[in-house]
Amino acid sequence: YTKLPAEAIDYFESIGNYLNVVSNGKLYKCRSTIKEMLTLLPARLFIQTHRAFIVNKRKISKFNAVSVHIGELRIPVSEKYAKSVMQKGF
């Protein structure tokens, strides 16, 4: 069991009933769903970009209507969440 401060988390990726939690290049696993995690995270800090991804807004280096980037890593933005991502204007 590892406790991570929200600010240190780069993103979450849903894999069934588990989440991959990535922080500073390290991978952690947690038993939770995207929906459950969204209720626990500060909305000012995180945004859902896809049914399978939640991203730390402060870690985004660039974005457009189809993807957000954390450094060189490209994370998809689905059509459902594109408007929200573009309105936030990181």
What name fits each language-model region?
Residues 1-70, 74-77:
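Conserved binding/recognition cores within well-folded domains
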